[in-house]
Structure formats: C-alpha cells, structure tokens
Amino acid sequence: MANVLVAMSGGVDSSLAAALLLEAGHQVTGVTMHLWDDDEQGLRESLCCAAEAAASARRVCALLGIPFYVFNYQREFRRHVIDYFIRAYTHGLTPNPCVECNRMIKFRALLDRARTLGFDAVATGHYARIIQGEDGRYQLWRAVDLEKDQSYMLHMLGQAELSRLIFPIGAYTKREVREMAAARGLPSADREESQDICFVPDGDYRNLLRIESPESLVPGPIVDLEGREIGRHRGLPLYTVGQRRGLGLGGGEPRYVVAIDPARNALIVGPAAALNRARFTVIDACWVDDAPPAESFTCLVQVRAHAEPLPARVSQQPDGRWLVELERPQRAVSPGQAAVFYRGQQVLGGGWIARPEVA
C-alpha cells in the first residue's frame, strides 16, 4: 500500500477521497494549502481558501485519525496565479486561473514537496479518472459525473504527474459522494460548494484589477467592425470577448465585444454573429501522453470549462502552433482560455487559445 498525501480543501470531495484511501489500506496524511494572508489588499477569502477550510479539513482528519498539516504557498500562488491573472487581463486575454493553479501549485509545487517528504503519491478530490492502459501508459479520462467533470482543468498533466496522482472520487457522482460522506459521518458531507474563483468570490474580478493594476485601466476607443469609433471604453482589462452589458453604446442592434486590441487600446464590437469562429490557433500545447497523437488528427475540442465539445481537425503548423478547424462555428472563442482536445471521454491534451491576429 502507498503513503499518500491528500490535498484537502475542507469540502466533501477531498474529505471522502481521504476516507476512501484510508479504507483501502493506504497510509494517509491530509494537507491544506495556505495561499494568502487574510488581510492581503484586494483579495477576499472564499470557501475553498478561507481559514475555515483548514479548520474543516483538520476536523475531518481528526475524525479519520490521520495526520494533518498546512503548507504555505502564498508566494507561489501570488506569482503563478494572481499575477498571471492580472497580467492576462492587462494584455487583453481572458485568463483561466484554475488551470494555472493546478499546473503550478497543486501538480507541481505540491507534487515536488510530497516527493521530498517521502510520499508515494498525491490525491485530490478532483472529478476525473486516471486509467493505466495495457501498454503501461497513463490516461486521463472524464469523470463518471459529466456535470462535475474537471478534466478540462487537468489537461496539462503528463505521464510524470499522472503516475503519482490519485483521483479517488472520479468514478462516483456528486450525489453518491455526498451520500458516502454522510454514511461515514464526515462533517463536510453537506458543506456548500464554491462556484467562484477562490480569490474573487463575488465574481467581480474588476474590483481586483482596480486595486492591483489601476495603471492598466486606460480609456480608449470602442470601434465597430469597419473601424469607426462609436464609443469609449474605461480600460481594456474590464472587458471580455462576448460581453454585451456595460458597453454604454445606447440602443439599436445589440453589440458584443468581438475582439480586444491592446496595440491600439481598442475594443472591437459587432453583432452576435461576429462572435462565431470556426478556426483558431492554440499555443503552448501539452499532451497527456507527452507527445501529440499525430501532426494532424480529428478530435473533440472544448474551449471553456462548461462548453460543449465540438468535432474538429487539429493540425500542427510550421511554427509549432496548432490550427483548430471546427466542424461548426463556436460562439465567443476567447483568447487566453484553454482549448482541450478529447477522443471521446479521454483527454489528449490542450493549450491556450491565441489572438486571432496571430492565427
């Protein structure tokens, strides 16, 4: 049996993960990652990151009779997640901080520390499945509960990471997880879920930008698809592709943010139909098998955490980028978001959606 470090948020998913591993005979230790100080300017704690999360995780570990620790990752979280989040918006991109947190904190810093401390594996409460094929290679699959599936956020995991990770609840539905936790008397069985970015729990990232990067909020022109100025914006980081509200353009046909042009400090707007894209480019691709399936292949592509996966052809370009050609157009494909490639329920890999002008 393995010596497993379980990343615990205090919620029902990671709590049950720890319980299941313990019941399977593993040696289990719980850990909560401390990501910032409560009084850090501009940042508010939410369910997944507050001091109450550590207290909840500690109670679960006490009930299970396993050790519990808190690891401090404030500096890493600031550099790799919050600074990245702000930098992306100031460059006209729509960031995905959860993907970066998984990539840099949970599945790099925590895995490295676990190895140093002598743990065989790290487990989390993510809804995804790891399957070892007949060839010995590790595969990443969607969770059984497709509504809770988090494989999109885990596409950056390769063989080195998957070989040392365990996702104990990926084979269960959320309802089953709650029932199993309640049956074991876990205090987190009925704990409310957090739906927001952990450092922006009210959902309004603009307040964070106003505090952390006020110099980036430079007013500029709003232009239509013909290049005519039809209004003024309050700073590009305050807008995202697909946004309609808050443009201040008055009546008439509804207009949406179609593109963001940092070079001209311009916000480009157009009708809803202009949001549809059938082709885009992906940069910095990574692959679960550590190599792409081919230079050109067909698959399903998902461009947002809860978007419908669409059939597409993906082809490598001479500069190393990947051209994605969708079978039918997708609405609001946002530069800066992850595009994740699937073969059925299996994750192949993914990368970051580039701006149209570099496609």
Swiss-Prot record:
The active site is at C101 (nucleophile), C198 (cysteine persulfide intermediate). One of its GO terms (biological process) is tRNA wobble position uridine thiolation. Keywords: ATP-binding, Cytoplasm, Disulfide bond, Nucleotide-binding, RNA-binding, Transferase, tRNA processing, tRNA-binding. Coiled coil: none annotated. SUPFAM superfamilies: Adenine nucleotide alpha hydrolases-like. The keyword Methyltransferase does not apply. Its EC number is 2.8.1.13. The record marks H126, Q337 as: Interaction with tRNA. This is tRNA-specific 2-thiouridylase MnmA.
